[in-house]
């Protein structure tokens, strides 16, 4: 019950927060609704699998035809692991805890820049999903394996597919990710299933079931709480600037996807672009 009340309060707080009209993403890691649209347009132009949608609940601070971004049928390799988390609810950040764990921001940065085993595994499997539905199980070979060891076979019923949604959060002034998944048989995934596809650092910490703000009904989805988004993205923006490779505000969404991919290492999320 406490988790439900906390979630309801946070959603109410976001609802009553006025939309920002200022621009200061280089110093805050946050963006305005206008910059959200600008960055979304850039994402759609560079990655045609993403598109704008309006839903059936229009939020007045965004253009009617550009309410949120969506990409569908994103392949995810199913992991056979156990995560000790509640079936429906996990911990989320509140104002009392938001400022006490900057070390987690550094961990997120390290996750983005390091070649973790999760991401390495996902990269070896990337590109295979498009053939699954046509050819069935595929044997995969590890290109870096000099000992010619055979990697596990991905069976058709082991793959999962997700629709990913990016909305604008008025309170945190950042994008927010929602996701809904199905197994290969078309059955909707439970929260426990979804936790299996989230990195161990994030599963059971910042992922909750939340109402999707652009649907009136049947709108509950898994969502990554955005309380840390701005601080992590700001550090990435500063790192690019220090390397004389500054990030423009229209490229912000690509950087956001790079950050998101560390939480979802088994998802085929493409953010590699010479922007």
UniProtKB/Swiss-Prot annotation:
List compositional bias (Basic and acidic residues) regions by residue number.
Answer: 123-133
Residue numbers binding a 1,2-diacylglycero-3-phosphoethanolamine: 1-10
* Keywords per UniProt: Autophagy, Cytoplasm, Nucleus, Protein transport, Transport, Ubl conjugation pathway
Pfam families documented for this protein: Autophagy_act_C
Q: Which GO terms describe its biological process?
A: autophagosome assembly; autophagy of mitochondrion; glycophagy; macroautophagy; nucleophagy; protein transport
Q: Gene Ontology cellular component? A: cytosol; nucleus; phagophore assembly site
Output the InterPro entries linked to this UniProt entry: Atg3/Atg10
- Can you tell me which residues form the catalytic site? 227 (glycyl thioester intermediate)
Q: Flexible region: where is this region?
A: 83-156
Chain spans, region Handle region: 231-251
Signal peptide, first to last residue: none
Annotated knockout phenotype: Impairs atg8-processing.
Gene Ontology terms for molecular function:
Atg8-family conjugating enzyme activity
Which compartment or compartments is the protein found in?
Answer: Cytoplasm; Nucleus
Q: Which proteins does it associate with, and in what oligomeric form?
A: Monomer. Interacts with atg8 through an intermediate thioester bond through the C-terminal Gly of atg8. Also interacts with the 40 amino acid C-terminal region of the E1-like atg7 enzyme. Also interacts with the atg12-atg5 conjugate.
According to its UniProt entry, the function of this protein is described as:
E2 conjugating enzyme required for the cytoplasm to vacuole transport (Cvt) and autophagy. Required for selective autophagic degradation of the nucleus (nucleophagy) as well as for mitophagy which contributes to regulate mitochondrial quantity and quality by eliminating the mitochondria to a basal level to fulfill cellular energy requirements and preventing excess ROS production. Responsible for the E2-like covalent binding of phosphatidylethanolamine to the C-terminal Gly of atg8.
Any domain commentary? The N-terminal region is involved in phosphatidylethanolamine-binding and is required for atg8-PE conjugation. The flexible region (FR) is required for atg7-binding.
Q: Which family does it belong to?
A: Belongs to the ATG3 family.
Write down what this protein is called. Answer: Autophagy-related protein 3
> What is the organism lineage in this UniProt record?
Eukaryota, Fungi, Dikarya, Ascomycota, Taphrinomycotina
């Amino acid at each position: 019950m406490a988790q439900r009340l906390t979630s309801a309060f946070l959603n109410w707080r976001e609802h009553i927060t006025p939309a920002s009209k200022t621009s200061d993403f280089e110093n805050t890691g946050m963006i305005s609704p206008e910059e959200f649209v600008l960055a979304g347009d850039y994402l759609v132009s560079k990655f045609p699998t993403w598109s704008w949608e309006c839903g059936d609940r229009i939020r007045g601070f965004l253009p009617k035809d550009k309410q949120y971004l969506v990409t569908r049928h994103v392949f995810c390799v199913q992991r056979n692991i156990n995560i000790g988390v509640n079936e429906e609810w996990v911990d989320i950040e509140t104002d009392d805890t938001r400022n006490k764990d900057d070390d987690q921001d550094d961990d997120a940065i390290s996750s983005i820049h390091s070649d973790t085993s999760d991401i390495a595994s996902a990269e070896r499997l990337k590109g295979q999903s498009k053939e699954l539905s046509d050819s069935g199980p595929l044997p995969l070979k590890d290109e870096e394996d000099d000992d010619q060891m055979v990697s596990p076979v991905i069976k058709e019923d082991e793959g999962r597919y997700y629709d990913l949604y990016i909305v604008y959060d008025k309170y945190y002034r950042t994008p927010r990710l929602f996701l809904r998944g199905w197994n290969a048989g078309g059955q909707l995934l439970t929260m426990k299933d979804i936790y299996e596809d989230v990195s161990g650092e994030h599963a059971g910490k910042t992922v909750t079931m939340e109402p999707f703000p652009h649907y009136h009904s049947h709108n509950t989805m898994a969502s990554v709480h955005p309380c840390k988004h701005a601080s992590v993205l700001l550090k990435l923006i500063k790192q690019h600037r220090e390397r004389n490779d500054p990030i423009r505000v229209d490229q912000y969404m690509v950087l956001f996807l790079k950050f998101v991919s560390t939480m979802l290492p088994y998802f085929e999320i493409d953010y590699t672009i010479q922007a």
